């Protein structure tokens, strides 16, 4: 049981995070794809700097995907054709690198090795067929020493991981340790 003196301010801050002007929304939420005519599931990610209230009254500049930290959760099924369109609105170049997923080398997001960095104001499309099931993540690999700790990361799920017999899942909450 949380001490009553802590509960009220904590509840108020959580309400402000979910309802207030923190980032452009709550992070880690499922991102709905746009289904293309050929069946490809397209996910649009805008990399941008956003004000983020990390504690009451303390606002920092977060580097975000679609205005949230962490970025949206992407979930697809094995065999899905996937397109991730990165729109770079940051003041420097960036890329998206995937962990825990099997993607073609040209789509692996390693700047100047597998692809050129995505310059400010430019877009790049990552395209691959999802293999899985897999629990993975995506994050920047360009200037990662500050872009990732500043917020450029998100969960990427392919299918559903098998659950042991007799175990009931009440809620799935992706957690990213980065």
Show the residue positions of the predicted features.
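Intrinsically disordered, low-complexity terminal tails/loops enriched in metal-binding residues
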Residues: 1-51
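Extracellular interdomain linker/stem segments of modular secreted and single-pass surface proteins
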Residues: 159-163
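Feature targets compositionally biased, intrinsically disordered low-complexity regions
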Residues: 24-26, 38, 56, 66, ...
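Acidic-aromatic/histidine active-site loop/patch
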Residues: 171-178
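Histidine- and aromatic-enriched segments that form or immediately flank copper-ligand environments
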Residues: 42-158
